[in-house]
């Protein structure tokens, strides 16, 4: 009798190329606007400070797409202990934007890349044990940090919206503001009236329509297109060998932890969508791939990489579970990274158009933070954590503007940052609202939400304390659903201790699992069972017997 070969898992299936190719392009389009935003932001800041030339932004865009493709292939295909082998797209994270600009302004571009390389190495080293540390980053902390990232980036969007120029002469002109709002209205219209497939790329379409409309008004400038070849190569260490400075590295190590927390959520989410169990080792493989992609990014003059959440949503919508869709998308990104003229087109998009799209894009980042915070029980303690963290982050936006008549022949306008009298190392870490807010949120959560068990039992904020793992909403729904099979409930009880109080009250949970949960000695579980026994005259503990 012939032995039947095991069925191929859906995540490993290789559909025909004619099906993979359009799906891969769909993933690229869904992430493209977010992927190129970071090199435009950081590159623009470095050009304004005289650290880079305008033409260097083309190289940053090429390098960003090229390494994003490599990192995506590593994550989807995998080798040895690198890659979660799921349909995950990799792109540059917004979390590092503020710290990198601060590092570049204070220490130069090469120090950015030295810090990025150190950040990636740190992520690879931390990957095997990060699952044990994630309890220190509950939704209260991660949601606050993501909200701060979105709010901090809005300043960049405002500069673009006004058509920010080096001289500031035309800044805030009615034409620029009008074009910014036009682009924003186009994005809103697409979200309201377009089919689902187009809504997934609403920001990219808004950029396209806004740019086309801006051309007759003379806002688009592609006069330099002839300076670039059709095909080019990304050069490692193009701006010089990386420099390593301690405070700059510390600033990005804080970002690294935020990146790993974000990627963990994406890996767990996509694992649920494609019905793949995420073991601690598999999670470590995915985080290690994030770190490797970040190291490669530092070598090729780009930035830290993370899984892109918008593509996780696309996997759920399309229902295509094969990881090779991401593989094809990664190859497409690598090819786009070899096209200088394509990067030059992006670099030439009018700033007001970028501003309109940026308001939507960065606002969506902030809204993602609000969505994460919706899982939090807002006691006075947790409100205080969020409020102070955002407040400390926004302090970095404070500037003193005055006219100094002693610096030259005439009056000179001067601006001073809040921390301008502090040492360079302090400014590098705390000048960015993102890193300052992240440090504050982590420390306040540890200080205010770490209390004895008896206090937590009476506090609605108990589930946000750092003693618990970051809960996944899909797992929580399964834990409470009476239709969930008993075997799945037992598996959840073993894998997700923070869900045991839910599982023990699920009528579908068999008596053996309930007994096992109670034997683990969790005081919260015991308190729940006692309460139900009081209500049911003892029938709760003997059900199913």
Model-assigned labels for residue ranges:
Residues 2, 35-39, 43, 183-193, ...:
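Juxtamembrane interface elements at the cytosolic ends of transmembrane helices
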Residues 2-14, 187-189, 203-252, 418-428, ...:
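Hydrophobic transmembrane alpha-helices of multi-pass solute/ion transporters
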Residues 12, 17, 43-85, 251-323:
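Membrane-embedded helical hairpins/re-entrant loop segments and their flanking transmembrane helices
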Residues 18-35, 172-184, 202, 215-217, ...:
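Hydrophobic, membrane-embedded alpha-helices of multi-pass small-molecule transporters
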Residues 23-66, 75, 82-108:
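Transmembrane helix-boundary motif of multi-pass solute transporters/channels
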Residues 59-60, 81-95, 135-144, 198-204, ...:
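Short, non-helical or kinked segments that cap or interrupt transmembrane helices
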Residues 103-220, 330, 335-455:
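Membrane-embedded alpha-helical modules
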Residues 470-545:
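Alpha-helical scaffold segments
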